[in-house]
Design a protein with these regions (language model features):
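Aromatic-lined substrate-binding rim segments of carbohydrate-active enzymes
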Residues: 379-409
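Secreted/periplasmic carbohydrate-active enzymes, especially glycoside hydrolases
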Residues: 1-380, 399
Length: 409
């Protein structure tokens, strides 16, 4: 009994530790001195509303009086402490799931990161820059308008950006939205106002880990039929040193059945491991109206020195999905074939649910996808003027049998 307890403790100690940094934030205009409480995740417009500095921009013509906000630089700041257990780990990373958009990140007054893309995650190692006690994290957001106008001025021609409401924004004909890796609709569209945001729009946290960790797992599906699913688990592992022996296993979470396993040596840095496996007579995933959208839960474990260094669980629908584009009497076909069955696509164009994306709750996401399913839709197109949606959005689509046609941004 004592041996079991010790083994469990060792396994727990090896797993990455996480601290969310969602409390104690404050913000201010960079050129002014007054600080105000801030909400993270959030954006500057919602923080200004919460502090009664501006009114609701969606009421009457309030939007017109708020175009000064995107011409200002903004600073967000908080403090945090890590436990001795986290400080004792070999590696400590600061991870931003989303920064909107041009941002310099400082830890204890040292610049550690420059961000320029709201669509991606940002990660940086911070262990050498941490203090044993209180640490100060500061983010300086540059005005996207001030950053991008020089790019517009430098060109002898103009990019097309017909929906950019530059005149409403007070920058005349300078449609700078095309220069930023940022949601296009923030600059105005034919269906919505111009509200160009800045802020920590997705979660931020610190993770501490030893030896190696799983960066990503993708279950590739080369061949799926009702008799057999041939699958490949593509596992990306980050190691902080050369490791002679590590074990990677994939199990079916519900039954605990081991589906694939491999002993590998890891090089320092990124390692990509492929684990082929198969499932006989799989329960297939079907779109809404054609059958049950069954999901398998796969767990991937990484073991180093007989300790679980990391684990990753993901729900996956097993299906064969193809675009059929073959010659016919009118030209070429263009339709979706799911598990060998032609699908009559019924759906809608999905645009972001709010100009201020952090306000969208999990409940709103679920209601939206469930409403689509209840309306007999089986596909949503993610419009290219918005953002790549949250993981929750795609998980709900999987759960309710909704196919996704994903635009690039």
């Amino acid at each position: 009994m004592l041996t079991s307890s010790l083994l469990c403790s060792a396994l727990l100690i090896a797993v990455p530790l996480r601290k969310e940094l969602n409390e104690g934030w404050k913000f201010k205009q960079a050129r002014l001195s007054n600080w105000y409480p801030a909400t993270v995740p959030g954006v500057v417009h919602t923080d200004l509303m919460d502090n009664k500095i501006i009114e609701d921009p969606f009421f009457r013509l309030n939007e017109r009086g708020m175009q000064w906000i995107d011409k200002e630089d903004w600073i967000y700041q908080t403090t945090f402490q890590l436990t001795p257990e986290m400080m004792g780990r070999e590696n400590i990373d600061l991870i931003f799931k989303g920064l909107d958009t041009y941002a310099d990140v400082y830890l204890n007054e040292k610049k550690i990161l420059e961000a320029n893309n709201m669509f991606r995650e940002w990660k940086t190692s911070i262990k050498p820059d941490l203090k044993p006690g209180e640490n100060v994290l500061k983010i300086y957001f540059h005005s996207p308008i001030k950053v991008d106008i020089p790019k517009w001025d430098a060109l002898p021609y103009q990019y097309e950006a017909g929906n950019d409401q530059s005149e409403n924004g007070g920058v005349f004909n300078k449609k700078v939205s095309v220069f930023a890796r940022k949601a296009g609709y923030h600059y105005g569209w034919d269906w919505g106002p111009r509200l160009v945001t800045s802020g920590i729009w997705r979660p931020v946290y610190v993770e501490a880990w030893d030896n190696a960790r799983i960066n990503d797992v993708f279950i590739r599906q080369p061949e799926v039929s009702k008799s057999r699913a041939s699958l490949i688990g593509e596992v990306e592992i980050l190691a902080d040193k050369e490791i002679d022996q590590a074990n990677v296993t994939i199990t079916e979470a519900a039954s605990g059945r081991v589906l694939a396993g491999q002993t590998v040596s890891l090089q320092k840095g990124i390692n990509k491991i492929s684990l082929p496996f198969s499932i006989k007579s799989p329960k297939l995933w079907w779109s809404n109206g054609l059958g049950e959208p069954h999901l398998y839960s796969f767990r991937t474990d990484l073991t180093v020195n007989n300790q679980t260094s990391d684990a990753w669980t993901e729900e996956v629908g097993l299906r064969s999905l193809k675009i059929i584009n073959r010659p016919d009497k009118d030209g070429k076909t263009f339709y979706v074939e799911l598990n060998g069955i032609p699908v009559f696509a019924k759906g809608a164009n999905y645009i972001p649910q709010d100009n201020f994306l952090p306000r969208v709750t999990p409940e709103q996401y679920e209601k939206t996808i469930l409403d689509a399913a209840n309306a007999n839709m089986n596909m949503l197109r993610i419009w290219g003027g918005g953002t790549y949606e949250s993981d929750l959005f795609y998980q709900l689509c999987d759960r309710y049998g909704i196919l996704v046609w994903q635009d690039f941004m």
